[in-house]
Amino acid sequence: MAEIPIDFPPLKIQEKIATILDTFTELSAELSAELSAELSAELSAELSAELSAELSAELSAELSAELSAELSAELSAELSAELSAELRERRKQYAFYRDYLLNQENIRKIYGANIPFETFQIRDICEINRGREINEKYLRENPGEFPVYSSATTNGGLIGKINDYDFHGEYVTWTTGGAHAGNVFYRNEKFSCSQNCGLLEVKNKNKFSSKFLCFALKLQSKKFVNYASAIPVLTIKRIAEIELSFPPLEIQEKIADILFAFEKLCNDLTEGIPAEIELRKKQLDYYQNFLFNWVQNKKLESLKSL
């Protein structure tokens, strides 16, 4: 290094060159600082946007899972338990008042001690029929607006709808065989029944109420089911022999209207407590989504302020 030759101009020229180089070095440092700041800002913005998106997705998935699990488990369980308990109580009340109002002694207490009763076998007051074979293939190939009822107990026994009907008007139907043999329903519409259903049509509607017949039969039908056979069964022959007592038509209708309204409240899928349970579940879903979105927005606002 000591042997390297260096040429020097006069001192005044050396000083001018050194001043120029110092100025250039200073400008270079300033430019480097500005470029560094600008690049840092751009990079920060890009990273912030990318990080925000990634973090938002992670938070969304995490919060959604946690919030959904916690709210659904806690609120849904509490709501379901509360309303289900209420429904059970209403059904107990219904069973109590049904049994009470269909008792001859109680009817006389309410409507008068001299209320007369007449006793008849089902065969004496009803035309008795049975449904026809309607399988799933027939339901698929003949879609329509008219209900088809079978031995099912959910949804009133409805199994589908077709484009024609076998019966029109007031009927009482019962399940002839299977686990639900002896279940009784009131119908008043255009409909059809499968082979697992029997039908009763009141002959004299000026003397007998189909609704009252339905409620009175519900108290007795299960007693006449043959549970000794391989499949429980309540045959047409057997149901025809059931004896029921009837007060005057006016009293029948009053009792039937009370029981029908109470039963509708307890069991109808579009009214009463079951509908309330469904409505509350929809409200739960709404507020759950609302709270989740609110929390998520708050988290994103915090990220943007970083």
Swiss-Prot record:
GO biological process, one term: DNA restriction-modification system
Pfam families, per database record: Methylase_S (PF01420)
Top-level taxon of origin: Bacteria
Keywords for this protein: DNA-binding, Restriction system
MF terms (GO), sorted A to Z: DNA binding
InterPro entries: Restrct_endonuc_typeI_TRD, Restrct_endonuc_typeI_TRD_sf, Type-I_RE_S_subunit
Record CDD domains: RMtype1_S_Fco49512ORF2615P-TRD2-CR2_like
Domain notes: Contains two DNA recognition domains, each specifying recognition of one of the two defined components of the target sequence.
Quaternary data: The methyltransferase is composed of M and S polypeptides.
Function, in words: The specificity (S) subunit of a type I methyltransferase (MTase); this subunit dictates DNA sequence specificity. The single R subunit has multiple frameshifts and is probably not expressed.
Protein family according to the UniProt entry: Belongs to the type-I restriction system S methylase family.
Stated name of the protein: Putative type I specificity subunit S.MpnORF285P
Natural source organism: Mycoplasma pneumoniae (strain ATCC 29342 / M129 / Subtype 1) (Mycoplasmoides pneumoniae)
Species lineage: Bacteria, Bacillati, Mycoplasmatota, Mycoplasmoidales, Mycoplasmoidaceae
